[in-house]
Structure formats: structure tokens, C-alpha cells
Amino acid sequence: VPDSTNRPPGRRKLHRDRARPDGHDPANPVVLDVEGSGVQPPVAPRVRQAFWLLERVAPAIGSRWATELWCTPPVMESSLRMPPGVPPGQPLEAHWNGHRVVGEAWGEGPLVYLVHGWGGRRPHLGMFIKPLVESGHRVIAFDLPSHNESDPGALAPGRTTAIECAEAVAAMIRTHGPARAVVAHSLGANATAFAASWGATVGRLVFLAPMGEFPIYLDLFAARHNFGRRIRAGLHRRLERRIGMSLEDTNMVRIAQKTGYPPLLLIHDPDDPETPYETSERVVASWPGADLMTTQGLGRLAHFRILRHRPAIRAGVEFIGPAQV
């Protein structure tokens, strides 16, 4: 229910019933953290107040505005540079439907692609570069559409969708060669799964804190922006028209059915407030042969700390294995 007092959401939880057509268990709801990690700035009070009013008097206008905000990646100032010891890579690019995707490459050997998450950029997975190069791989990291140096897609500059991000992943693999492995974070994992389901050649997958079920994020988005069911329903419809499919069909469990189930290591922390750990448990349970590595103690910044967590990095590199084997 929208808050007429215009208070910030604060530390509160939402419980989302998982009894939906894809077989979720209503006795075990997903718990959503409204405040999140705090890395992104809170929604401005004037925006929350505007959505509260639009929910009552003009939900169609509110849903149009919400759709544009949803498709706008946040600007996060963390990890703007590669880690120490990682030199500038060889510049490269790929194109899809005339849109340019910008990246860099290091080393020689079988290809491993690094795919950042929503609002990220290619340095975010930079801790994987040195050990993967040392194990005999050529490593390619790139920026998703409307992120950092890459062009926007069909939407206005500064906006994109998960489907456009998947197009970028598929274009990179198509242009530069089959992936011995892909290491992907958050929305980048979903984009990678989509690319694999479309036929991109992927040998092994390392997913860090993936966004397992997209519809649950509408609940979080509504709570953070202070709108209710009318705007949310309009946002849902508009997003489905924009991406050309049901939001339920963007759930990782459903996407995976068309990937051929390549070997998967999924790494996640139960403290992650941005992507629910429970959804990763369900992905692994549905993915034959998949392994779940549970990190501990990364706190409210777990969604981002996992990218620098040495046990997680070591596990991912070992799962991929040396290139000569």
C-alpha cells in the first residue's frame, strides 16, 4: 500500500507469495528487502509523493513514468577501474542490430567472458581477469547496452532492458568465438542464460547472485517508489510489451530449460538484500548437475562484495579449470 506520509521505505520486508503458474510454493514466500544494500541513493521524496498521487488520479501516466525509470540503469560510482595488476586490455567491440558493444581482452587461449550486472561496468568482474589469464585463457570483459562505453539499444540513451543485454552477450560470443565459460553477475547472469537459450555456445557458467525471478522486483520497485497495484499492473503490461514476452518467462528456471543445462556453479550469499538467495536455491534445484556455493558474512553489501570475495573468485576459477585440460 502506498504511503501517504511520504516516508522513506526504511528497513522493512515484503513477503511475496510464490504460488504462481510456474509451481512456486506458497508456504515458503520470498522475503524482499525494501531498503536494499544502500549502494544506490534512495528514491527522492518528491518522486515518492508524485507516485502516491498518480496511483490515485492518473495510474496510466504513473505506469509510463515507472516503465522509463525501470529501464534506466543506476549510476554507481564503485569499481570504476580495474584491480591493481590488471593492465589495459586490447580494445574490441561487437554489434547487434547496429548497436555497438565495447569491451577489452586479455591473454590468449580459450575464451572466458565476464558479464557485469545492472548498473555495473566491465571492471566489476576484474578480479577474475588475472587468475583466468594465468590459467591459460583469453578473457573478454565488456559493457552492456547503455552502460559505460557501450551504445544504447533501441531505447533512449541511458535506458535498456534485460533482453537488449542478452543481445549484447550473444553478439560478443558470436563475434569473438565460443565461450569456454562465462562468469556473470546479477542481471548479467540472466542475460547470459538468455543468450545461451538462443544458441550462443557456452561451455560452463559461473553465476554470482543472479536475478532469479524478475516479477518479484516489481514488488520492490513499487515499494521503493511508493505506488500501488494500479501503477504496478500498468508497469507489468508495459514491460511485457516492451520485451515481447511474459515476465514469468524471464525467470531463470524457465530460461534454463532452453539452454541445454551447461555445467553451472552458482555463488550467492544469504545476506544479499538485492537478489533473494531463495531464488538461487530454486535455480540450482531445477538445473541438473548445478552446484550452489553459499558464501557467509558478506553483510548488506553482499551483492557487490561477492565480486571481490576471494573464496568465491577462487571457486569460480577452479570450476572453469585450466585451459589445457
Residue ranges with predicted function:
Residues P157-R180:
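Alpha/beta-hydrolase active-site loop
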Residues R122, I129-P152:
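Conserved alpha/beta-hydrolase
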Residues P273-T279:
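Conserved alpha/beta-hydrolase "acid-adjacent" motif
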Residues W198-M245:
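Hydrolase active-site cap/lid region
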Residues T259-G260, L265-H268, D272:
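Short beta-strand/loop motif that positions the catalytic acidic residue
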Residues V183-T192:
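Gly/Ala-rich beta-loop-alpha elbow adjacent to hydrolase catalytic centers
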